[in-house]
Amino acid sequence: MHIHKLKKKIKKKKEGKYLTKKHILRKLFLNEEEFRKLCIFKGIYPKDFKEIPLKYRKKFYKHKVFYTRNDFLKLSHEKIINDFRKIKIYLKKYKKCKLTLEDFTRSKNIVANFPVYKLEHIIKERYPILSYAVDHLDDALSCIIAYSQLPSNHKYGIKNNMVKTCEMLKDHFHYYVYKTNRIKKAFISVKGYYLQAEILKKKVTWIIPHIFTPYLDTSIDFKLISDFIEYYIALLKFVLFKLYKLDNMLYPPKQDNDLKNEKLAHLSYDKDYSTNENNIDINMNQELQSKCNVNTNEDLNTCQEKTKEKNHKSDNNPHEHTTNIDNNNFNNIHLQDNCDLNKNEGKNLTNNIIHKNSEADNGHVHPDDHIDIDEHNKLKELFKNHIFYIHNDMPFDVLSIIILSCGGKISWNSRISPIHYDDNNITHEIYEKDKNTIHLNNPENEYKRIHIQPQYIFDCLNEKNILPCSDYLTEKENLPVHLSPFIEDENFKNLVKKEEYTINKMLNQKIKEEQYKDFSKENNNIFKSPNYKEEEEEENDDRETANLILNNKRQAALNNQLERENEDINQLKENDTILNKQTDQTQILKTQNLKSQEQEIQRHKIVLSKKKRKLFARIDMAQKRQKATIDKFMKKINKNKSK
């Protein structure tokens, strides 16, 4: 083959690497809506015009959408395309039966056998390992939670079924998170409540928005958003099923109807707060006792047969007889204990399973694993022996997730709540006091409990310690600074400016130091030695000497600084004089260079032909006109400024 033909062939191949959207739609026989869905499910996005090399841009236009040939091949081998075609056929049949033939029985059968496409194989292709899927849960969770708060509207493309499934999946995830004690960080912002959990050693962050009245804007394409959410629903279902299985939990969890009617979200799946809890426990105990009785009866029958054979020996040795009876009783008790502990077997194995999976993925044990386990155990029992009463005005969902994941207990204003407001075991009460309105009917001092604001729980979780409640009381208007815990994470540095964070941290440290000093003074006053006066005098003398030394050092440092500043000023003056001289010299050189350049141009003009001289003159005139217009414009601006 000739070289020119070979070059043309290579050029055609490289130009054929990029295909237009119109070309792909013709090849696949799809609508724009179906093609958009398919691209969202497969994670294929269009290429920018600038990504195409300059050599091959002649054939393409800026306003068109382009995809690569590899993207086209991925889409062409997809199973869902056949499902889309089947759906079209069934829709035609349904319209024909209902509208033209008016055969309603046949139309019902068509609806019952309507084809449905599944996305499980696509999720397995995109995320072959479960940890990869957990990495990409951030967007999925925040989108699903936001979509669950929208009102259903078929005109805009917000489907009622999808809204309900989003609510259900949100509750399933929150139930799993607080039941397995996974929450690590939380933050209150203008957008909503940021929460972070650690699942399979991967950080998952999501937003729970504030309660608001939704406003549907016509500029937003909700049909496109619903396509994304259809994919996110499939992904979250897949991940939740696997996570529940790892922790020996049933999926989907059973929901209590009474708690569901009161709209308690994730708590409706919790057995600890269900109304039928006592009945369930009684039935479980009866079943376990029946199993244990069967086992004990079998063991007793075998023991009786053995004892008949060994009666003669026992008559001779009475000690052996007593020991055999005691062993039989011990075995029966041991069986009953094992039956009672069958409930909690799954809970004890969860941490070991996760630890083994992480080791299998990495192939070795990290030295920081022990630190992570200690932190996890610390957060697990952060609010242990604490009972919080949450008022109706507070964000119940967020506070309940954090408190329950940290080992605390909850009560609220309802007949279903396990702990009522009158109970003396309640340690804290969460609400915000307004100036104009009285929040509580009962006075504060009626019950011995601490009245705090909701920021206290967020700050305790971020600090991983129980903070003093005196700074977060409902009476106080100026609360301590609420710092963002995501400043250390690379993905979430943009949430808070670093300068603000450092300033707030400095302020917070000063407040803590002052509190610590006050606390130490109080302790010293309580535990004073008999010779405390002499010790105080010695301490005061030491402080005075230290202060004198510090003052001397400060004065010496100031004097050195002043001397350096004077030296710098003198150097600057010298530099200015040198610069002025240099500028004068440069200006002289510039004028000389310009003159020499003009002389050279005139010499070249003499050598040029007549045509080129005229062309050069035109260029020169055009440049002069441009300069004149610019000068006029600048003069006008200066006049306006002077006025």
From Swiss-Prot:
GO molecular function annotations of the record: ribonucleoprotein complex binding; RNA binding
SUPFAM superfamilies: BRCT domain (SSF52113)
Record family assignment: Belongs to the pescadillo family.
Physiological role: Required for maturation of ribosomal RNAs and formation of the large ribosomal subunit.
Organism: Plasmodium falciparum (isolate 3D7)
Basic and acidic residues: compositionally biased ranges: 305-323
Subcellular location: Nucleus; Nucleus, Nucleolus; Nucleus, Nucleoplasm
Any single GO CC term annotated in Swiss-Prot or TrEMBL for this entry: preribosome, large subunit precursor
Keywords, ordered alphabetically: Coiled coil, Nucleus, Ribosome biogenesis, rRNA processing
Principal cellular location given in the protein's record: nucleus
Listed name of the protein: Pescadillo homolog
HAMAP family: Pescadillo (MF_03028)
Keyword Coiled coil: yes
Keyword Transferase on entry: no
Residue pairs linked by disulfide bridges in the UniProt entry: none
